[in-house]
UniProtKB/Swiss-Prot annotation:
Its main location: cytoplasm. The gene is Stfa2. This is Stefin-2. InterPro entries: Cystatin_dom (IPR000010), Cystatin_sf (IPR046350), Prot_inh_cystat_CS (IPR018073), Prot_inh_stefin (IPR001713). A motif (Secondary area of contact) lies at residues 52-56.
Length: 103
């Protein structure tokens, strides 16, 4: 947990540009997302993210999935261990300028 995430307990952080760590989180849940949406994404690039500190970390990540399409994913991390990731939700048919919100 970074110093930044320690400061926001319970609330949703401001949007931040995606880092390599955020891309890695997204990549780990990609197979499950593709199974749930019945899609194979040609591109899967994390653009930005917000974090909510709960018992673990709740990541809301905006993904560019190619052809001008975006989606938002919600990934819960750290409930049973730091490496434990759970895809807890997703929103399809999003636009580049759609704000990440709690869902």
């Amino acid at each position: 947990m970074t110093e930044y995430t320690r400061k926001i307990k319970g609330g949703l952080s401001e949007a931040r540009p995606a880092t390599s760590e955020i891309q890695e989180i997204a990549d780990k849940v990609r197979p499950l997302l593709e199974e749930k949406t019945n899609e194979k994404y040609e591109k899967f690039k994390a653009i930005e993210y917000k974090v909510q500190v709960v018992q673990g970390l709740n990541y809301f990540i905006k993904m560019n999935v190619g052809r001008g399409c975006y989606l938002h994913i919600n990934v819960l991390s750290g409930i049973s261990s730091e490496n434990d990731l759970e895809l807890t939700g997703y929103q399809t048919n999003k636009a580049k300028n759609d704000e990440l919100t709690y869902f």
